[in-house]
């Protein structure tokens, strides 16, 4: 069951974005980089309100026409709610280069390390709080809405998206980040030793929940490379606390 709990991120279960303007016919086509919409605070992406202001359009949402039948093939999945109910209150808008893609077709790809049981392509199915932009240099928000360092790179604060949900409809909150780090990754009963990339100078960080949509990493020493670690890591920096806490004996006495 746990493996079915996915984070309903930007396009939520096959959702994509179209823009709707005040033109006489009520519609305008989706924008691309060629239309001059190159990004807001971060390259090639906007917050919804930011995009609507820049493009002079109001967005409406559509979905993969086959998503309901695909969802029904997974045993135990609930029926899908309406598109608007699946999206967070603050969805991310990613601007395509040339056109909005079409559903269907076959993708072919090469893998450099199949003998290691990994797949270059399949590894991209996971999303994290941050990601690298297409220039492979700029680090931009992904699951997170925004992030900010303090002046000496010892605290990293994430702002999450209001109304963000897991695939079962439960809220995705700062507690999911704290639970992942403090209760799972730093728990010696679960991992004898923490992963080196989760330490700074060999010392653990701490994670504080400021409110439901604000979470802060406190570092024992300056480490500006943490954002790059989060952006490239295959391992997600959050777990569904609402589901996993029932199996954690230090949290639930019935576990």
Language model features with spans:
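Extracytoplasmic/secreted proteins, especially bacterial periplasmic and envelope-associated proteins
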Residues: 65, 69, 124, 142, ...
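Bacterial N-terminal signal peptides that target proteins for export
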Residues: 1-9
